[in-house]
């Protein structure tokens, strides 16, 4: 069965003007959100960007492959995907920015997001899923019985703070909990932001309690 690596071998040399953005590209960027970009990708207060190629070089100048592989982590392979991305023209020159990585024990929140500027006039907003922290897993359990979690509210604020009043089209996605955050943020963001959302991707993301499913904001983003 073909995988992401096979896709990059097949399409990695074609930019988005030749082969438009597809669901596999979404999967790739949702996985990229698991890379620890602290000190590498500019934060949301910087209004600056960095290419994936440079982010990859900077990351591997800080961490060796042996060090990464020695980690006890379910997401430790994400940096190696990033290394694969820069071997072709499809992703290497894309710009990353608006990076956030927060752990808040009091609010029981593990939150991270990054934006990828695709060069086709759209931005992919990638929310990270659960990491290896205790608070991240506790937040997952909270999502099983709370309609609104601190992380979900933070996801809405992230989308509004970075894109309210703009004009570009948005793609919003994530893997696992990140997919849930993508749907929640797209449902409850400001109307002018929601109108610009081209597509929402939840890749193996958990669902919602009935109260959310009945909300008008959620129903507006349904395909």
Regions found by a protein language model. Name each.
Residues 35, 129-133, 206-209:
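Short loop/turn segments at secondary-structure transitions that flank enzyme active sites
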Residues 152-223:
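Serine-dependent carboxylesterase/thioesterase catalytic core
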Residues 19, 115-117, 219-221:
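A general structural signal for short secondary-structure junctions and capping/turn motifs
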Residues 7-8, 92-95, 103-105, 179-182, ...:
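A short linear-motif detector with a strong N-terminal bias
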Residues 60-170, 191-197:
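A conserved cap/lid and substrate-binding interface adjacent to the catalytic center
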Residues 44, 137-140, 200, 215:
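Surface-exposed beta-strand edges and their flanking turn/coil or helix-capping segments
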Residues 1-76:
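N-terminal low-complexity, Ser/Thr- and acidic-residue-enriched intrinsically disordered segments
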Residues 23, 149, 176:
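Short, conserved micro-motifs enriched in small and acidic residues
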